[in-house]
């Protein structure tokens, strides 16, 4: 889906949440640290969810 093409957004908050995003350049779901607010749809709690939605 199109959310998989959105850029990784850490956001301005300071929570330290391990999430995954689909990297459209590599075609893989990649871990990143999410701040907890103002993210976008390319933000998954599990690698499995990222792969399922973005077909990585």
Swiss-Prot record:
Gene3D superfamilies: Pancreatic trypsin inhibitor Kunitz domain. GO terms for cellular component: extracellular space; nematocyst. It is found in: Secreted; Nematocyst. The keyword Secreted applies. Disulfide bonds join 4-54, 13-37, 29-50. The keyword Disulfide bond applies. Residues 4-54 form the BPTI/Kunitz inhibitor domain. The record marks 14-15 as: Reactive bond for trypsin. GO terms for molecular function: ion channel regulator activity; serine-type endopeptidase inhibitor activity; toxin activity. Pfam families: Kunitz_BPTI. Keywords: Disulfide bond, Ion channel impairing toxin, Nematocyst, Protease inhibitor, Secreted, Serine protease inhibitor, Toxin. Negative results: has no activity on Kv1.1/KCNA1, Kv1.2/KCNA2, Kv1.3/KCNA3, Kv1.4/KCNA4, Kv1.5/KCNA5, Kv1.6/KCNA6, Shaker, Kv11.1/KCNH2/ERG1 potassium channels and on TRPV1, the capsaicin receptors. A synonymy between H.magnifica and R.crispa is controversial. Belongs to the venom Kunitz-type family. Sea anemone type 2 potassium channel toxin subfamily. This recombinant serine protease inhibitor inhibits trypsin (Ki=210 nM). In contrast to other sea anemone serine protease inhibitors, it does not significantly blocks histamine influence on intracellular calcium concentration in murine bone marrow-derived macrophages (tested at 1 and 10 uM). In vitro, it shows cytoprotective activity in the oxidative stress agent 6-hydroxydopamine (6-OHDA)-induced neurotoxicity model. In this model, it decreases reactive oxygen species (ROS) levels, and increases cell viability in a correlated manner. This is PI-stichotoxin-Hcr2m. It comes from Radianthus crispa.
């Amino acid at each position: 889906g199109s959310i998989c093409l959105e850029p990784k957004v850490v956001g301005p908050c300071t929570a330290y949440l391990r999430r995954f995003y689909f990297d459209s350049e590599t075609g893989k779901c990649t871990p990143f640290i999410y701040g907890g607010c103002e993210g976008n749809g390319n933000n998954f709690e599990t690698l499995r969810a990222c792969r399922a939605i973005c077909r990585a």
